[in-house]
Amino acid sequence: MDTRPLAALNDLEQYRRLFTDVALWAPFVRAVCSRHGLAPCERVRVGIPGTCPAFIVEDRWVVKFFGRLFDGAASYAVEQAAGRMALSDPRIPTANLRAWGALGGEGWPWPYLVFDYIDSISVGEVWPQITAGEKVRIARALGGMVRALHSLPLSPDGPFPRSHEPYAQFLAEQRAGCAERHRECGTLPPHLIDQIDAYLPPIDHLIDRSRPPHLIHADLTGDHLLGRLREERWQTLALIDFGDARTGDFFYELAALHLDMFRGETAPLAAFMAAYRLQSLVDFPRRALATCLLHQFNVFWLLPPELIQQPTLESLARALFEV
């Protein structure tokens, strides 16, 4: 297939302008659908903008493409593998991965994944409207779901190393320049950022080596839990977007889950922890906050301003993670 019209997306500025352009992408979306016998495929609309070009077809399928930018080849392999792993366990609701492949042609091959479309909203869209009791019920169900995800066996020939070392190296790289990254984000107050270097413990203190290396979703934000809210009751339909999945540790998983999805609320955190059944709670608040600081994304941005106006990182850790 002639993919030359997509060559402009090798440039970052052009990518930002074009990755949601339905007129540009519709012929390629329809070609993918035709290749896999998905018909009809006339109505194409853009999905919620993220990192990758993603389009909804006839409200039945989602076609997601992976470009050269943002390490697309690795993201494709990771999301395909993690999605198939999640589908193997009925305790983990997720979107059915219907097809995969690549457009081909000259230059970048544009690998893609095709998922069944889920008519839903994200829990992040309605979290402020959900009752306190319902939030606890959601969190309790998530505890079992995430425990199941973390228990999936890792294949020796898959993209997820069966070793703690790559994750330890990743955290070490995140530690370098951690304070400066938070200054650039501007979410945490300057007096807390000044404390980061002294607050961060040795990397080994953040990894539970008593557990085997395991898969983590690594970006469990409110955007990535889909469902329906009817008469004040939430029904979970799918956990989605495994593009950042990796071999990792519980504390890294907790960062986006608690600070983004739960908005730092401790009652859902307590329910989640009880359902997950974490064995070791030694120095829990510090290890949890330190891993949040090292996260590849700014997981603090949704927290209420009054919550992060703590005098010290130690007091912030207690406010967020003492349950």
Annotate each PLM feature.
Residues 1-29, 83:
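Phosphate/pyrophosphate-binding loops and the adjoining catalytic core of nucleotide-dependent enzymes
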Residues 13-18, 70-74, 309:
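Short, flexible/disordered intra-domain loops and linkers
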Residues 20-40, 102-106, 113, 119, ...:
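An alpha-helical support segment within catalytic cores of ATP-dependent transferases
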Residues 26, 80, 266-270:
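Short, surface-exposed alpha-helical segments at coil->helix boundaries
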Residues 41-165:
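ATP-binding pocket architecture of kinase catalytic cores
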Residues 50-58, 63, 201-252:
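Active-site acidic catalytic loop and adjacent metal/ATP-binding pocket
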Residues 92-93, 132-134, 211, 264, ...:
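Membrane-helix interface segments
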Residues 140, 177, 244-250, 255-323:
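Helix-rich C-terminal or lid/interface subdomains of diverse kinases
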